[in-house]
Amino acid sequence: MQFDFPFIVSAMKEMVKTIPLTLMMAVLPIVFGFLVALGNIIVRIFRIKGLVACSRFYVSFFRSTPAILHIMLIYLGIPPVADQVSSFFHLGWSANEIPVSMFVIMALSLTAGAYLTEIIRSGILAMDTGQVEAAYSIGLTYSQTFRRVILPQALKVSIPNFTNLGIGFLHTTSIAAIVAVPEITGTATIVASDNYAFLEAFIGAAIIYWVLTLILESANGVLERKAARFQGGTL
């Protein structure tokens, strides 16, 4: 079969339309996962009784199992539970009304939360303990020290890891095609199925992922420069 160069362009035009959905499934899990990670960090730092073990189990489970399983567990497990809740409380709605992409975002948010917990924790461990001691010496409480010194510095140190995770999640969105979410890779498969030009379609998809990754890497450089103002904490 002859290689079809023009089809790469036409396939990319269709895939470009799915970039907003793809980015949403990559960015929102990082945002929600960051909130989950902050909760985990607070639980561990303040050693909240009964929750430390739960936090460790959560992080261990989601870092030790593949994201595709998380998606399938949420995609297959949440709808029956949601329907039961709706029926019990007479809410009058069905899980079928929930966009499939929302299940993907839920699953990847839990995945991101586990990884971000370890990223932020490693950033905290990398801190100079002298800064914490200095904060205590001027009368800051532990919670104030955490909010104004520890967390800003840990986030600054962790920016490259955040970017790497974001790039990884951008690529991970490709597995959403398994539950029929039309993101970049899923759309490439669909547009290629008419004339079996799968090679051309996937080359187009690779170009789009490459460009998006370059943009994220550039954004990382900007963030690192802006975050330099947090050097030394925010006392």
UniProtKB/Swiss-Prot annotation:
CDD domains: TM_PBP2 (cd06261). Keywords: Amino-acid transport, Cell membrane, Membrane, Transmembrane, Transmembrane helix, Transport. It is found in: Cell membrane. One of its GO terms (cellular component) is plasma membrane. Residues 15-220 form the ABC transmembrane type-1 domain. It holds the Pfam family BPD_transp_1. It comes from the Bacteria. GO terms for biological process: amino acid transport. The chain crosses the membrane at residues 23-43, 59-78, 100-120, 165-185, 196-216. The complex is composed of two ATP-binding proteins (TcyN), two transmembrane proteins (TcyL and TcyM) and two solute-binding proteins (TcyJ and TcyK). Belongs to the binding-protein-dependent transport system permease family. This is L-cystine transport system permease protein TcyM. It comes from Bacillus subtilis (strain 168).
